[in-house]
From Swiss-Prot:
Record protein name field: Endoribonuclease YbeY
Source organism of the structure: Histophilus somni (strain 2336) (Haemophilus somnus)
SUPFAM superfamilies for the chain: Metalloproteases ('zincins'), catalytic domain (SSF55486)
Compartment list: Cytoplasm
Role description: Single strand-specific metallo-endoribonuclease involved in late-stage 70S ribosome quality control and in maturation of the 3' terminus of the 16S rRNA.
One CC-aspect GO term: cytoplasm
Cofactor(s) the record lists: Zn(2+)
């Protein structure tokens, strides 16, 4: 299996308690499972202001969110290893981890896995899609040594 190349951008004023690029790569690898290519993705860690702006601009939601996924769409005749960008809001991830009583790094891992699956084309708009995506997320998180990220909801 080939490693996902991670371009980590930290655009948060507070860079403490963030996962390392190696951790992010491990979590993304588990979700993407690249066999024949070496995919590349950007992970941008931002503050609430940027997350809010992007969420409003691209999803019409007037609030910050935990993770936004921007899949890279390339013309069929061009082969590039880019799969897309993840934008993750530090404050939202920290707040959710506290509210859900989860270890912070487990929640960071879940956001990387969740966002990576979106980059691969998975979605959770329809119930059947949501069930499949949650099943995959749980399987991947367990393989990484974390607990089921949806345990509080089940």
């Amino acid at each position: 299996m080939k490693n996902v190349i991670i371009d980590l951008q930290i655009a948060s004023e507070d860079a403490t308690n963030l996962p390392s690029v190696e951790q992010i790569q491990l979590w993304a690898n588990a979700a993407i499972r690249a066999e024949n290519s070496q995919p590349e993705m950007t992970v941008r860690i931002v503050d609430e202001e940027e997350s809010h702006h992007l969420n409003l601009t691209y999803r019409g939601k007037d609030k910050p969110t935990n993770v936004l996924s921007f899949p890279f769409e390339c013309p069929d005749e061009i082969e590039l290893p880019l799969i897309g960008d993840l934008v993750i809001c530090r404050q939202v991830v920290e707040r959710e981890a506290t509210e859900q009583e989860k270890p912070l790094m487990a929640h960071w891992a879940h956001m990387i896995v969740h966002g990576s699956l979106h980059l691969l084309g998975y979605d959770h708009i329809e119930d059947d899609e949501a069930e499949e995506m949650e099943r995959l997320e749980t399987e991947i998180m367990l393989s990484l040594g974390f607990t089921d990220p949806y345990i509080i909801e089940k």
